[in-house]
């Protein structure tokens, strides 16, 4: 009982402190009411449309594109979106599959952008864009991928160990506790230093704070899509 009480107290502490800095920007933001939930997005600039889609790491959000979007908006209408389950978007309790994101991207372009658009995506999200283009080539103009996943890795099916991890992490108390231990500030700092950046001096504390906040919005995550590294 004492152990469970300790887990509960720790979870409450993380929930109350992780988002108090309000680091996720809402300027120029709106919500797209999609069939599975509300999706936060921003629209800036004028010109040919460009959609920026972030990675699916548990701490990812459209903050990933904050510097790039400022440059692109000088010549383009730039859209960024927080994928469902990420950032300021809704985090419904459902299975987050690749095909669900393909549907979301397709619907967003048709309903919000309403014209053929170029898409820039990173890591696993690149696969969503490729599939969306295969299903409907009329919605995407050009595709640019940053550090995309290999096609061989996309062939892998979830094994029993992966399913067990997902079952544990989805437990209301214990799963949340484990997730909070995994997605702590020190771990996020290591991700930036050894995965995201080759020049640590370029890492800003504001960016790390934004990722930490995104990782703990509503205590839900995409850990069943992309486990923390």
What residue ranges belong to the model's regions?
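Alpha/beta-hydrolase fold catalytic core
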Residues: 1-50, 74-76, 114
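Conserved HGGG/HGGXW glycine-rich cap/lid loop of the alpha/beta-hydrolase fold
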Residues: 43-88
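Conserved catalytic-core motifs of eukaryotic protein kinase domains, centered on the activation segment
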Residues: 62-64, 89-94, 155-156
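Active-site loop/oxyanion-hole signature of alpha/beta-hydrolase fold enzymes
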Residues: 80-120
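Conserved hydrolase catalytic core segment
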Residues: 115-158
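Helix-rich cap/lid subdomain of alpha/beta-hydrolase
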Residues: 154-209
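Residue-level detector of conserved catalytic or cofactor/ligand-binding positions
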Residues: 223-229
